[in-house]
Curated annotation (Swiss-Prot):
HAMAP family referenced in this protein's UniProt entry, alphabetically: RuvC
Transmembrane segments: none
Subcellular location as annotated: Cytoplasm
Gene behind this protein: ruvC
Annotated organism of origin: Synechococcus elongatus (strain ATCC 33912 / PCC 7942 / FACHB-805) (Anacystis nidulans R2)
Cofactor annotation remark: Binds 2 Mg(2+) ion per subunit.
Protein family per UniProt: Belongs to the RuvC family.
Catalytic reactions of this protein: Endonucleolytic cleavage at a junction such as a reciprocal single-stranded crossover between two homologous DNA duplexes (Holliday junction)
Name of this protein: Crossover junction endodeoxyribonuclease RuvC
Cellular-component GO terms for this entry: cytoplasm; Holliday junction resolvase complex
Residues forming the catalytic site: D9, E72, D144
Cofactor: Mg(2+)
Molecular function GO labels: crossover junction DNA endonuclease activity; DNA binding; magnesium ion binding
Principal localisation: cytoplasm
One Pfam family in the UniProt entry: RuvC
Amino acid sequence: MGQRILGLDPGLAIVGFGALLCPDSRQGSLELLDFGVISTPAGAEIGDRLETIYQDLHQLIDLVQPDAVAVEKLFFYRMGNTIAVAQARGVLMLVLRQRRLPYCEFTPAQVKQALTGYGNAPKLAVQQAVQRELQLDAIPRPDDAADAVALALTAWFQQLA
């Protein structure tokens, strides 16, 4: 049957998601079940934006019914943006806890290493690896969704290792 893995790329404005049906071994074929974004309006109050993420993630989990979740680990770049991402990430982690879903966390460098063999690979190389692994006609868009699919792939690769 395989395992359903949901990848989540946290953000306050946009949470990317990608859901895979992964075979039990490398012999089977991967299936991209769904991908997209949860978005929040820029002008809304922070509490309203976080509530949107909370509610929409619960709905997404009901739809996808994942067995496991892969979440991008927070890294620091611009302090203001980091705080907003941390708040959104906290909501994601709360929902995963409430739903009793096992999760793993990966840094962007770990995802790049897993998919391209190079921890400093450019974003396009990672996106092309996603397209190749899933035998897609095009790279998933937007970038946040492609990143989330890459997280789910990384989780599957780690399980096979």
